[in-house]
Amino acid sequence: MSTYSNIKIGIIQFPGSNTERETFMACTRAGMKPVEFLWNNDPNELSEFDGYIIVGGFSYEDRSRAGVIAALDPIMGQISIESEKNKPVLGICNGAQILVESGLVPGFENNQVGIALTDNKRVKDGQVLGVGYYNTWANLKMSAEPSRCAFTRSLEKDQIIKIPLAHGEGRFAMPESLLDNIIMNDQAVYLYCDEEGSTPNEFPVNPNGSLYNLAAVCNSKGNIMAMMPHPERTENGDQIFSSMKEFIQMGNPITDHVLVHNQESYSLKNYSVDESCTEWLVNMIITDNEAVSVQNILIQLGYDVVLTRQTHWEIKTAGENENILKKIKESGELYNSNKEFIGKRAANKETISILIHQKEDMHGRLKQESLTDRFQID
């Protein structure tokens, strides 16, 4: 264990990371020594540090899913090894997304991925106000016992702090059965709330539609936390960093909690379009950097693949089909004809197409409301 003045915290940064300056300042205010550590440094050098903070930003431009490419970098394998020594790891915003995609949170055996951080949704009185990126100040309630987590020790249970948030994919999502286990295990450590501490699950108190108003979740042992808001951007969040310091000074006192959950297994099924719907598969005219990034990481992992991406729309009309489809094309809502075009399914026998969509398609719902309300297309 380091002495007070020599507590070294590795500030982990990837291409596209930001807020490192604010994180340095927060660590310094807490009496810790922040040290920059880049994704392409020698991962073995991470053993020199007492703890780690993965900063916010947009690693690898959030391509594919926010945090997923960074989660596959070799540095995260070493972070996992260091966390097994009970060292504290804090992921803020994009850092939280990286921890979730790497499986370090919620903390299943072998770091199996169990939860997701998906697109924000802002819904009030049944109306979609917006999806995607949003920034505001939010009230957070610390909902666990102070000793539960490395990042709660300086706060009282039910204490409220007000800190900023700024993200596009910050909505915690998971199976209800897993959520129940996380709540019972006291891993739901910070919740969005109003000024009185109530937690109505609706915008604006819940700024991103997160399940159970989750703002931060820790792993079962309590030494790792994924937090979407930004405590480093304000002195209001300093207690999170002083908690980290105290945890290190006390010798990394983890808890004996164990997260048990039976993960469902999934298999691919053949998909057919509803006969009453028109299917549009939208291709990019320009280079699809997102597809290229995913292809490159798959090749690095040993998969010899060529990957392309299409956006899938299914349109069901109630009136004159061709006339309505023409109006939708002209609206530009579903695709931009300057850089996209309606393509076809791949016919090559060596090609497999996998359809991926959100369990709750907020983007589709927003587009439908826009076509109906803004363009008067029924």
Residue ranges, per PLM feature:
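Short, solvent-exposed amphipathic alpha-helical segments in soluble enzyme
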Residues: M25-R29, L179-N181, E232, S242-S243, ...
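Short, hydrophobic/aliphatic alpha-helical segments
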Residues: I75-E84, L155, E275-C277, T351-I354
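A generic structural motif
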Residues: V35-D42, Y192-D194, L307-Q310
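Non-catalytic terminal accessory/regulatory regions of metabolic enzymes
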Residues: H167, M250-D378
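N-terminal beta1-alpha1 cap of cysteine-dependent amidohydrolase-like domains
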Residues: M1-P106, K121-Y134, V205, L211-Y212, ...
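Amide-donor transfer/coupling interface in amidating biosynthetic enzymes
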Residues: S2, N41, S80-I81, A116-S272
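Structured core elements
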Residues: G10-Q13, E36, I53, G91, ...
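A short alpha->loop->secondary-structure connector
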Residues: P106-L117
